[in-house]
Amino acid sequence: MIELRPLLQLNLEDGIPVLKDLLTADSFSFTDVELLRYIPAIAKNTPAQTRDLAASVADALDVDQTTALAAIEALVELGLLVPSASISSQKAGIQLWVDKGWVDALILHFASRNLNYNDDPIEFGGLEDIKSYPEPMESKRRKRGTATRLVKPSRELAAAVILDGLMNRRSFKPFTRKQLSITEVSEILWFGNLYARERAVIAENRDFESPRDIAFDSAFSALSTFVVTYGQIDWQDGSLPPGVYRYNVVNHELEAIRAGDFKLDMAKLAIGQSRASSGLFTFVICGDLKSYTSRYRHERSYRNLLINTSQLAQFYLTLATINDFNTFLTPAIHDEKMHLFLEAEDDLPLYLVTAG
């Protein structure tokens, strides 16, 4: 039994058709362009034995079997048609991504995984000359408005629950939830910031264990989350009016910035995306690049900040899914206007996550 490699991308390079295997990064050039017309028919009729495949392709393309067999043998010689047993595990892995609706993400991953970054060597701006740096900037933040202390979650999340949240999240499900509890807000923020909380305490108290701990500090220490709620949240001991809040990750509390219904404002700030404020709440993840680069003095710092931002967003998305919310995320924000709206001081708006 033979069949085509499972994840092929067709490109034109210097006017010559090239099929690229995204899994292995192998490329296959076609000097005989006529062979390309056989590939769709082969894909529809494999896996199959060579002779059976030739008959099916000949029938599909209205050519004789000898011609079809010659094309198939040419593709085998190129390495595009391979024994089915050699790619069974690859097919199973790809099919999982297809079933979950993650095809675009899979293609982007394979297309970008081997990109080279032109960073300076670690000896420049890294650990070797950390002693010549001045002390890191103070990272203590001023207290904002009235703070609402959140109760630490009473449950722990089992690995199976987290995996279920990861596998079941979708980007385009409609919002269906009508109410939001303070327990759900607390749980998402608490578990989403476990590592960020640890690093923030270290940075705020300047409790670095060594120069290395300063030089290679995680960007999680420089991330903060602003919470925008679109309806009043009531519970036994209090209530939280709709408005904008800054999450104090160290104290696990929400500091009031401004009260009001900001659905329309948030949609405009998300460049007109109504879905950005159609849920029950929005998290705006921000980063203090200046503070972070004062500790990690390397050009990788900006990239690290963006990567850790996306990781925090993934935590929020997964935790929201665990709590039966549907989600939406976007980096498409009017940066300066959002910064002013949030009164974010040194924090730069980077990513927006909405759930409902």
From Swiss-Prot:
**What is the protein's species of origin?**
Rhizobium leguminosarum bv. trifolii
InterPro entries, per the entry? Bacteriocin_Proc_Enz, Nitroreductase-like
Q: Which GO terms describe its molecular function?
A: oxidoreductase activity
Please give the name of this protein.
Answer: Trifolitoxin operon protein TfxC
Source taxon at top rank: Bacteria
Q: What is the lineage of its organism?
A: Bacteria, Pseudomonadati, Pseudomonadota, Alphaproteobacteria, Hyphomicrobiales
* Alphabetical list of CDD domains matching this protein: McbC_SagB-like_oxidoreductase (cd02142)
